[in-house]
């Protein structure tokens, strides 16, 4: 059983810096840069990683470690694929994984990989609070170049409780067995601002609640306190004592909702992996709620 320290969802930049300076026997640490950006931003996450990263970090490619047979972006891979990929990045059964990204927000895509490790049964995983942005602000050391972690043996077993499918969400329109929170920007949720992907109109799934993922972060890019997050959920009438599912555009920022709930003592929030892209492509026009064009065919 992992120590409570290893199960903490967030670790500070100073904690990571100290752990790198003085590694603990029997508790190997592996940092992963899980930076990912929407194509329209024109940022090359891997190239940026090679230019600068936290010492000892390896690059985790969300698109590469995915189900490449799916028509939808970066859907969860099979257990064997994930195990092989994580092992190549130096993650073994006893490894404490600390994930960050280099986004301007502080954390953007890293919570997706935090959720992936947990979904595949590895709970010794944390996020670097504030990401690379906060690390830089603390003037902590950096490295450059490609990383070459020593491969490790990693075993993965998917817990299906971490995922919801299109069919689950569709059935929930009638049954209302669980609440659904959408973490996209308000304009995209309402249908008044464009989606970043061609061929996908903005809008939302009927009955969903909108909490943009940036609402979970402070101006400095650090995660808000559990008290502030609890208030955020309460403001939107989300009951953390009842089942809750998170969605977004393609299953990345939804993981901020799962993280926020986890910090409030609710570790069981699954992600609708296909999220809005899948819903828009598969749902009936009347199940696409929008103040804009909606779905016309």
From Swiss-Prot:
<dbReference type="GO" id="GO:0009440">
    <property type="term" value="P:cyanate catabolic process"/>
</dbReference>
<dbReference type="GO" id="GO:0016784">
    <property type="term" value="F:3-mercaptopyruvate sulfurtransferase activity"/>
</dbReference>
<dbReference type="InterPro" id="IPR045078">
    <property type="entry name" value="TST/MPST-like"/>
</dbReference>
<dbReference type="GO" id="GO:0042802">
    <property type="term" value="F:identical protein binding"/>
</dbReference>
<keyword id="KW-0770">Synapse</keyword>
<keyword id="KW-0676">Redox-active center</keyword>
<keyword id="KW-0597">Phosphoprotein</keyword>
<feature type="modified residue" description="N6-succinyllysine">
    <location>
        <position position="164"/>
    </location>
</feature>
<feature type="modified residue" description="Phosphoserine">
    <location>
        <position position="35"/>
    </location>
</feature>
<feature type="domain" description="Rhodanese 1">
    <location>
        <begin position="25"/>
        <end position="144"/>
    </location>
</feature>
<dbReference type="Pfam" id="PF00581">
    <property type="entry name" value="Rhodanese"/>
</dbReference>
<dbReference type="GO" id="GO:0005759">
    <property type="term" value="C:mitochondrial matrix"/>
</dbReference>
<dbReference type="GO" id="GO:0004792">
    <property type="term" value="F:thiosulfate-cyanide sulfurtransferase activity"/>
</dbReference>
<keyword id="KW-0677">Repeat</keyword>
<comment type="subunit">
    <text>Monomer (active form). Homodimer; disulfide-linked (inactive form).</text>
</comment>
<dbReference type="InterPro" id="IPR001307">
    <property type="entry name" value="Thiosulphate_STrfase_CS"/>
</dbReference>
<protein>
    <recommendedName>
        <fullName>3-mercaptopyruvate sulfurtransferase</fullName>
        <ecNumber>2.8.1.2</ecNumber>
    </recommendedName>
</protein>
<feature type="modified residue" description="Phosphoserine">
    <location>
        <position position="3"/>
    </location>
</feature>
<dbReference type="GO" id="GO:0009636">
    <property type="term" value="P:response to toxic substance"/>
</dbReference>
<feature type="domain" description="Rhodanese 2">
    <location>
        <begin position="174"/>
        <end position="288"/>
    </location>
</feature>
<keyword id="KW-0007">Acetylation</keyword>
<keyword id="KW-1015">Disulfide bond</keyword>
<dbReference type="GO" id="GO:0019346">
    <property type="term" value="P:transsulfuration"/>
</dbReference>
<feature type="active site" description="Cysteine persulfide intermediate">
    <location>
        <position position="248"/>
    </location>
</feature>
<feature type="binding site">
    <location>
        <position position="188"/>
    </location>
    <ligand>
        <name>substrate</name>
    </ligand>
</feature>
<dbReference type="GO" id="GO:0070062">
    <property type="term" value="C:extracellular exosome"/>
</dbReference>
<feature type="modified residue" description="N6-acetyllysine; alternate">
    <location>
        <position position="40"/>
    </location>
</feature>
<dbReference type="InterPro" id="IPR001763">
    <property type="entry name" value="Rhodanese-like_dom"/>
</dbReference>
<dbReference type="GO" id="GO:0043005">
    <property type="term" value="C:neuron projection"/>
</dbReference>
<keyword id="KW-0808">Transferase</keyword>
<dbReference type="GO" id="GO:0001822">
    <property type="term" value="P:kidney development"/>
</dbReference>
<dbReference type="GO" id="GO:0005739">
    <property type="term" value="C:mitochondrion"/>
</dbReference>
<dbReference type="GO" id="GO:0045202">
    <property type="term" value="C:synapse"/>
</dbReference>
<keyword id="KW-0771">Synaptosome</keyword>
<dbReference type="GO" id="GO:0021510">
    <property type="term" value="P:spinal cord development"/>
</dbReference>
<keyword id="KW-0963">Cytoplasm</keyword>
<feature type="modified residue" description="N-acetylalanine">
    <location>
        <position position="2"/>
    </location>
</feature>
<dbReference type="InterPro" id="IPR036873">
    <property type="entry name" value="Rhodanese-like_dom_sf"/>
</dbReference>
<comment type="function">
    <text>Transfer of a sulfur ion to cyanide or to other thiol compounds. Also has weak rhodanese activity. Detoxifies cyanide and is required for thiosulfate biosynthesis. Acts as an antioxidant. In combination with cysteine aminotransferase (CAT), contributes to the catabolism of cysteine and is an important producer of hydrogen sulfide in the brain, retina and vascular endothelial cells. Hydrogen sulfide H(2)S is an important synaptic modulator, signaling molecule, smooth muscle contractor and neuroprotectant. Its production by the 3MST/CAT pathway is regulated by calcium ions.</text>
</comment>
<feature type="modified residue" description="N6-succinyllysine; alternate">
    <location>
        <position position="40"/>
    </location>
</feature>
<keyword id="KW-0496">Mitochondrion</keyword>
<dbReference type="GO" id="GO:0000098">
    <property type="term" value="P:sulfur amino acid catabolic process"/>
</dbReference>
């Amino acid at each position: 059983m992992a120590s409570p320290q290893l199960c903490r969802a967030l670790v500070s930049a100073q904690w990571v810096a100290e752990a790198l300076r003085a590694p603990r026997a029997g508790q190997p640490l592996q940092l992963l840069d899980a930076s990912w950006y929407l194509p329209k931003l024109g940022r090359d996450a891997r190239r940026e990683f090679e230019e600068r990263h936290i010492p000892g970090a390896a690059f985790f490619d969300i698109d590469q470690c995915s189900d490449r047979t799916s028509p939808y972006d970066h859907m969860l891979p099979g257990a064997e694929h994930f195990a092989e990929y994580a092992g190549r990045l130096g993650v073994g059964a006893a490894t404490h994984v600390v994930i960050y990204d280099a986004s301007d927000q502080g954390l953007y895509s890293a919570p997706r990989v935090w959720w992936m490790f947990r979904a595949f049964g590895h709970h010794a995983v944390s996020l670097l609070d504030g990401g690379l942005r906060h690390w830089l602000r603390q003037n902590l050391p950096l490295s450059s170049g490609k990383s070459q972690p020593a491969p490790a043996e990693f075993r993965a077993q998917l817990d299906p409780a971490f995922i919801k499918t299109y069919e689950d969400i569709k059935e929930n329109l009638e049954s209302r067995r669980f609440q659904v929170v959408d973490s996209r920007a308000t304009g995209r949720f309402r249908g008044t601002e464009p989606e970043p992907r061609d061929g996908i109109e903005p809008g939302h799934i009927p009955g969903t609640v909108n909490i943009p993922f940036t609402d979970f972060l402070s101006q400095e890019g650090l995660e808000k306190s559990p008290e502030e997050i609890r208030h955020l959920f309460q403001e939107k009438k989300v009951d953390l004592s009842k089942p809750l599912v998170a969605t977004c555009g393609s299953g990345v920022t939804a993981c901020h909702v799962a993280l926020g709930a986890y910090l409030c003592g609710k570790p069981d929030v699954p992600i609708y992996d296909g999220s809005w892209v899948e819903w828009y492509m598969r749902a009936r026009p009347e199940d696409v709620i929008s103040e804009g064009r909606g779905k016309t065919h």
